[in-house]
Structure formats: C-alpha cells, structure tokens
C-alpha cells in the first residue's frame, strides 16, 4: 500500500477518513520523501486546525439567511458562512452534485466546498464547459505535483491547465532529469492519490506564513514576493502536498476517473538570476475511463495526421539543431506558405489594407516606451550592438551607425506601426489607416515548449493594425469579423467567438472600457455568429474578441484575434487633426486572422491529413506516361502545366508498372493524375484521374489546364469532385 507507506514513513498517523486499501507498489518505488515535505505538512495541519476553528466561529457569529440566484431566475435560501455550493447542488440533483467540478459565484470561480458568504448569483461548472475542464486539469496537475514531490523529491514550480490537459514544472537539481521509465511510476502514484480520494483543502495564509510554508522552495518564495500583493494568499493542501495556488479545485481527487501521463521534457524558469532548467511532465485526465479511451482513439487518429509527419513525407519542411525554433521550408512547403500569404494579400487589397515592411531589430527604448520591455522582456531576444563591449565608440561617426543601446528582435509589430503612423501629421480625412505586415517575429519560448510548427522562436503573422476614430470603431470591428469568416470559410474551419472584458488591474478610464465593450458587443450581435462572454479575461490595455477555430477533427485552435488598445496610442502620443482642427487620439485595433502563418499551416496539414485543396496543394498534378514512347509527350504536358503556373511532376519510372505508379500518386495525395498513352499523344489529350481513384476520362489538354486554373483561382475546396 504505497500511499499509506509514505504517510507512515513521515511519522504521521493515517487519517481515519482516509484509511483504505490502495494499489501495492514495490518498495523501490517508495523512497523516503524529503524532510521539508513533513515539516511543511505539519505547519499546514496547524494552520488548518486554526482555520477550522475560525470558520466554526464565523458560522456562529455571522450566520444569516441569504438568497442565492441560480440560472434561469430560480432563487434558493442559504445560510452565510455555512451553506456551500456543493450542498445546493445536492439539493437540486444528485447527478449535478456528482458531475459539478466547481462553481461560479458572481462571475468568479469558486470551490464547491467553500461556504457562501453573501447573496450571490451561482452557476455550476461541469467538465463539459471550458472553465470546468480548466479546473479539472488544474487539480490533476496538483496530483502530479504531489506524486513528483513524494517520488522524486521534486521542488515544484508551476502546474497549470492547458487547452488540452495539464503539465507540472519542477526542479530536480542541475543534473537530474525525469527519465521516460519514471513516467509509469509517477502515473501509478497519481492513481494511488486518486484512489484515496484526498480532499483539496483551501487555506488563506499570511505572507509570513507563506514564507514559512515554502522556505525550502525558492520558486514559490519568488512568486510570493512578486505576485502576492495583499496581506494573504491561498494555498491548497492535497494529501501530503501543499501548494501556493489561487484555485479553485475539485472537491477531492476521487473525482478524477482516469489520468494518463504523456510526455517529459525540459522548460526554463526565468527570474532575476540565471535561467534554471526545470523538468516538465504533461498529462491528460477525465472524469470517466471511457472518455480517456475515446481521447486515446482520437489521439491515435491525430498522430497519423501529425503535421511533422506530413511535412516529412511530403517534403514540406524540416528543422535543424543549428537553428533551433526556426523552420526550413522546402520548395513544396514554400508553395503552401506562399499560397496562404497570397490569399491574405488579395483580401488586404480588397478590404483597404496597406502592406508595409518594418525593421526586425530595434533599440530597447522602443520597447520601454511601448511597455513591452516591462511586461514581455523575458520572452524577447536581445543583444548588444557590435563594438560596445568595453570599447568607446563616441568618436566613430553618426550615432545611427553605432548605437549604444541594447537591441532586441521584435516579438510583435504594433510599436513599429505606431512609429509609422506618427512619422508625419495625420488628418481625420485619411482615417482609418490599416497597416498590414508579414515581417519576421521572434519570441523566446522556453526550449522545452518548442514543437513542430506550433511553437517557434521565429515566425510570421498576418499582423495588421487599424488606427481609426472612435465613431469608426464598430464598422472596423464588423469588417474584421467579416474578414475572419471569409478566410475560415475558404479554409474549411468553423469557429467560435468570445468577448473578453476588462480584467482586474486594467489601465485607462472605466468609461472608455464600458464604451468599447459595448461597441464590441454590438458588433458581435450584428455579426450573427454564436459568441460567449468571458468577464475579466481581456488584456490590461483593452477588451478583445478571442477566436477559436475548429479543424476537421473538431479540435480547437486559437489563431485569430481582435483586440482594442487604449494605451499604445497614448504611450506614443499618436494624434490626428480632427474636423474642428484640434488634435485627437486614434483608437488602435490589433487584428490577425491566420495568426502565425507557420502554426496555421501546421493546423491545416493536420486538418486535411495531407490531402491539400488544389489551390494550396504542393502536389497538384503528376503526369504519368504509359510507356517510354510517351515520355516526351508527358514532358510537354508537364511544361504546359508549369507555364500556366500549376505545380506538376513527372513519374516516368519505367521500372514500375502503370498501376504501381498510379497507386504511388494516390498515396502521395496528388490532386490529379494525367495519364498519357498513345491515344492521348495522338489527340493531344490527357486521361484524368483524381487522388480518390475517380476516373474522369479523356480530356483535351488545353481545356484541362484552363479548368485547373479556374478551380485554383476560385479556391474551391473540392476541385476533384467538380473538375
């Protein structure tokens, strides 16, 4: 009984409510936990005992009748500091009580076992909701952290939920890493914690108490000093583990029906000192085993569509250790990349955007002015100019040729576009100014998070910024939304929108935020697509519309965005002369449809499984001669296709039969095969087949080329069916 053994080794009696038979693990997999684990747990128990007494006193002193408003207008009675959301859920339905993972009280996430304090609006969250999944996977990350502490003596750093599961970063020492063989052991300990149904216990602690609890964890001490601005912060205890966390969490670990650890990698912790290498273990969990099995089946199907696999098989791109975090696009991959960019460029021209080019390297003074240096410095690549290492360049000529400032590669285009807007006087007559930029961006993602095209150090975006007058804002937002719908429709993606409103600590006047949020809401309502409200999830500089597209496998991806920005125009003192001749400040809209072109290309590759639509395809047509006598005509056909701007290859491998070459073309996912024999040569025709083995018969060569061009230019998704 591995978990029981660990408790007894620390000298603590096994709590009566947790005495249970657990899965047996070998003695070798149950090393003695570090001394600080017992010390921290002992202090937590002391604080918890005091907390329970305080709560009992509050229940007696402040108990009063309160009204709880439920969805659909229903109201129920409760007692302040006594009634919990879980108790109310149980009154409504046993099924609801069993499936709820957390509550939402007045728009804020709330533990199910935390007593309600006053009249409020209450909503229950299940695993089916995005918020419910986030809570569920966050709690699962805590279980993983507890296992890592007990098994590996890990010093925990962070354990968040993600869009597709969870991970935990922890420190094992400078030389120690997590081996793949240790994942099954960690997973088994997680299963023990789950089987024990350990409760998640929420406790508020003072800053001094927090420092005592985490005196052996320099990561948590750093977070306490940096993030804890009030007199107290919350910690959660789960079994032997205690962690600094805002919560909320599940009621107990037994609500996790199935958990699987997936990968181990490295990550970086950046503070004021030198970066430290952390170990990252990721996983997935579900309320029921059946959901895990379904996920595994979908994952297996997704692995067959992995864009890295498709990129290798179709010779689209590759990566090299000599340029980490950057992609090498081969000719075929460049064809897809350029087709995507050309699509967006065509829409830019149609919608009144002006494409610009801006520098890649800037003085950090720019980023200080924009505020990015303060908030984003850890994710930027910076360098010293040549000749500044101890060398006096004061007499070396023009300052522009010998800058002394630290330089940084741009991680986004918005400050450069602000400089471009401000470089000459502007009039209200030229608004809106819509600037688009495909310039290369660099962001210093942790090396452990790099993976294929989804996370890169170097990438490009279909980045654009709109400078407009306040009265133009709604029309511009509607234009951005229409842009999204147009592009995603052509690419075959469905999408969902969410309006994120002002967060705590927002900058600017509340009145401006109210007006902007109202404008965004009106634009969304007129747009006619479903959307959700995410209160408090906006950026500190303005509200935003988050866009989640769904691929052919139903997986969500956040690529596009529409964000309002009140702060950057003020920071750069942007002005235009209004109708009355007085200077006025423009509103700035950040917008992207594809987001990272590289990432979107990867999403597309997986969504279509390598069967690219004709207009994007790097494998449009392969010409196959029946015999060597038709090889010369086959080359003429290929040249005719290439002259028209179509991608074509020739398969004249005489060592393979015709049927083998046709099959090879199908497996390679060529959209069309033009087979030419003696009859086709004499008639100047081609015998057309599709990649799905539909035989369209003999067609005139010139007409076939013209038809392909029509289908390509129209960007139809099913050219093989409508040829």
Curated annotation (Swiss-Prot):
Keywords (A to Z) from UniProt: Aminoacyl-tRNA synthetase, ATP-binding, Ligase, Mitochondrion, Nucleotide-binding, Phosphoprotein, Protein biosynthesis, Transit peptide
Catalytically driven reaction(s): tRNA(Thr) + L-threonine + ATP = L-threonyl-tRNA(Thr) + AMP + diphosphate + H(+)
Classification via PROSITE patterns: AA_TRNA_LIGASE_II, TGS
GO molecular function, one term: ATP binding
PTM annotation (Phosphoserine): residues: 57
A GO-annotated cellular component: mitochondrial matrix
EC numbers: 6.1.1.3
Major localization listed first in the record, in broad terms: mitochondrion
Record bears the keyword Ligase: yes
Residues passing through the membrane, by range: none
Domain of life: Eukaryota
InterPro entries: aa-tRNA-synt_IIb (IPR002314), aa-tRNA-synth_II (IPR006195), aa-tRNA-synth_II/BPL/LPL (IPR045864), Anticodon-bd (IPR004154), Anticodon-bd_dom_sf (IPR036621), Beta-grasp_dom_sf (IPR012675), TGS (IPR004095), TGS-like (IPR012676)
GO terms classed as biological process: threonyl-tRNA aminoacylation
The protein's role, per its UniProt record: Catalyzes the attachment of threonine to tRNA(Thr) in a two-step reaction: threonine is first activated by ATP to form Thr-AMP and then transferred to the acceptor end of tRNA(Thr). Also edits incorrectly charged tRNA(Thr) via its editing domain.
Subunit structure: Homodimer.
UniProt protein name: Threonine--tRNA ligase, mitochondrial
Organism of origin: Mus musculus (Mouse)
